[in-house]
């Protein structure tokens, strides 16, 4: 199946990302959860025909998750030997591929300084497990993404942040959102799609006002909703895809109110 490309009514978002990539700049995609940051990175990877290695950050991320680890392997002579298995950072550097670091502000600040040399003009790292000095081959690029104001995120270290050029990625809307729904979900009826877009606009407004979490207004949740609407009533589809994910009763009630206004 062909990759469904990232779309945005603001063409500068993708065009600038492509320009920064061509200049070999580290790109930091900044925006609300579910706004399409990963889709943008995947689209860029396809457009430039360069594979992408992904790191999903969390508080449990450690150096081995980034660089790799040692393990015991049986060689052709039947003898056991210790070998190093390259992690996503070293693989991307050696192969001239894209390194995508998702939710980089979820990682503990003390984990990421190991990447400083990778992210500056040197484009190299000394593997702390083997002593090997790895110099990135041409084609290697770094894209990272952060969710704004998301639970569990930490402020980015200034030294790390200064190694990136930032592109803000906001939610899509209007005709672009309508086309994305038609291309990436099972829902095709124009009238229902218009209702869903209006409902999503209300959710985004409530999210910006702090009444509900960003995830409730995400494009990801919206596309799930559109699929479910084709097999069940819209009210139940909203309950399954959005409301039941929320723990706060006030957030749930706010969305129930939006449902009553829109459907």
Curated annotation (Swiss-Prot):
Family listed: Belongs to the CbbQ/NirQ/NorQ/GpvN family.
Positions of ATP binding: 31-38
This protein's record includes keyword ATP-binding: yes
Name under which the protein is recorded: Uncharacterized protein SAUSA300_1302
InterPro entries in UniProt: ATPase_dyneun-rel_AAA, CbbQ/NirQ/NorQ/GpvN, CbbQ_C, ClpA/B, P-loop_NTPase
Coiled coil: none
Origin superkingdom: Bacteria
Entry keywords, A to Z: ATP-binding, Nucleotide-binding
Pfam families documented for this protein: AAA_5 (PF07728), CbbQ_C (PF08406)
One term of GO molecular function: ATP hydrolysis activity
ATP-binding is among the record's keywords: yes
């Amino acid at each position: 199946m062909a990759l469904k490309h990232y779309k945005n009514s603001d063409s500068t978002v993708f065009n600038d990302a492509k320009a920064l990539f061509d200049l070999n700049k580290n790109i930091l995609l900044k925006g609300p959860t579910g706004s399409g940051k990963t889709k943008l990175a995947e689209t860029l990877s396809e457009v430039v025909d360069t594979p992408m290695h992904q790191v999903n950050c969390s508080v449990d991320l450690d150096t081995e998750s980034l660089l790799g680890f040692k393990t015991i392997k049986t060689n052709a002579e039947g003898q056991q030997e210790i070998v190093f298995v390259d992690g996503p950072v070293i693989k991307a550097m050696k192969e001239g591929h894209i390194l995508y670091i998702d939710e980089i502000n979820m990682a503990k600040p003390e984990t990421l300084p190991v990447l400083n040399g990778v992210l500056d003009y040197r484009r190299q790292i000394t593997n702390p497990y083997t002593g090997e000095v790895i110099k990135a081959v041409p084609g290697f690029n770094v894209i990272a993404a952060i969710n704004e104001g998301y639970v569990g995120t930490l402020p980015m270290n200034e030294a790390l942040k200064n190694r990136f050029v930032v592109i803000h990625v906001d939610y899509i809307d209007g005709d672009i959102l309508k086309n994305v729904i038609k291309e990436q979900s099972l829902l095709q009826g124009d009238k229902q799609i218009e209702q869903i877009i209006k409902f999503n606009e209300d959710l985004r407004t409530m999210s910006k006002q702090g009444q509900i979490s960003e995830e409730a207004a995400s494009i990801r949740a919206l596309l799930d909703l559109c699929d479910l609407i084709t097999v069940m009533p819209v009210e139940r589809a909203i309950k399954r895809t959005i409301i039941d994910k929320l723990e706060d009763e006030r957030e749930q009630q706010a969305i129930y109110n939006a449902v009553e206004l829109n459907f």
